[in-house]
Amino acid sequence: MAEEYYSLRSERVTQLLVPNSESDSVSDKSKAEQSEKKTKRGRDSGKHPVYRGVRMRNWGKWVSEIREPRKKSRIWLGTFPTPEMAARAHDVAALSIKGTAAILNFPELADSFPRPVSLSPRDIQTAALKAAHMEPTTSFSSSTSSSSSLSSTSSLESLVLVMDLSRTESEELGEIVELPSLGASYDVDSANLGNEFVFYDSVDYCLYPPPWGQSSEDNYGHGISPNFGHGLSWDL
């Protein structure tokens, strides 16, 4: 009896344990598959950027398409060598079909995108192709703004330098003392000296005879006697 009891108990224990082991193995397998999918998805997303309406072909090209409004069909936009080109094509088609409610990959380029002539699939494809081959203007605008800011900064620095130089020159000119004119002072002094002083050389006048045509009476006006020469003789 005891042996039968232990055998039945062991069988029941194995029956209870086997399903649990199978379920554990199944759960472990599902977890491993999920983690592998997440890892693969992470590797795939890290290789290239992900854009709305853009898919990658097996041979490395990028395709873009968009669903027509209120229809099950899609508008084929084309195959492109880069994901950015396909994303710009999708943005043009989305703007044409959905308007302001469209979700864009490059919202900053919305104003520069070409517009289709009509909402027909052919016109949308033409506009999308133009947008795909257009050059992005974000880098150009950023470089232009930086260069303009540098030029404005350099012009401001040059203006400040010119102002400093002009201020220095004005200060140096303010320190110069205005001197009187030499010619004017000379004329005034000479006139005053002419009025105050008279030069008279009596010795020269006595030694040299008077000019021709001048009488001896004229010498009286100068205080010279006509017999001045005779007065110098000595009686021996």
UniProtKB/Swiss-Prot annotation:
UniProt biased composition (Basic and acidic residues): 26-47
Pfam assignment, any one: AP2
Top-rank taxon, per record: Eukaryota
Cellular localisation: Nucleus
Biological process per Gene Ontology, one example term: ethylene-activated signaling pathway
CDD domains, per database record: AP2 (cd00018)
Residue span of region Disordered: 17-50
Molecular-function GO terms, alphabetical: DNA-binding transcription factor activity; sequence-specific DNA binding
Family annotation (SMART domains): AP2 (SM00380)
Annotation: DNA-binding region: 50-107
Key words of the record: Activator, DNA-binding, Ethylene signaling pathway, Nucleus, Transcription, Transcription regulation
PROSITE patterns from the UniProt entry: AP2_ERF
Gene Ontology cellular component terms for the protein in this record: nucleus
Ranges annotated as spanning the membrane: none
Keyword NAD carried by entry: no
InterPro entries: AP2/ERF_dom (IPR001471), AP2/ERF_dom_sf (IPR036955), AP2/ERF_TF_ERF_subfamily (IPR051032), DNA-bd_dom_sf (IPR016177)
Main localization of the protein described in the UniProt heading: nucleus
Role noted for this protein: Probably acts as a transcriptional activator. Binds to the GCC-box pathogenesis-related promoter element. May be involved in the regulation of gene expression by stress factors and by components of stress signal transduction pathways.
Family affiliation: Belongs to the AP2/ERF transcription factor family. ERF subfamily.
Protein name: Dehydration-responsive element-binding protein 3
UniProt source species: Arabidopsis thaliana (Mouse-ear cress)
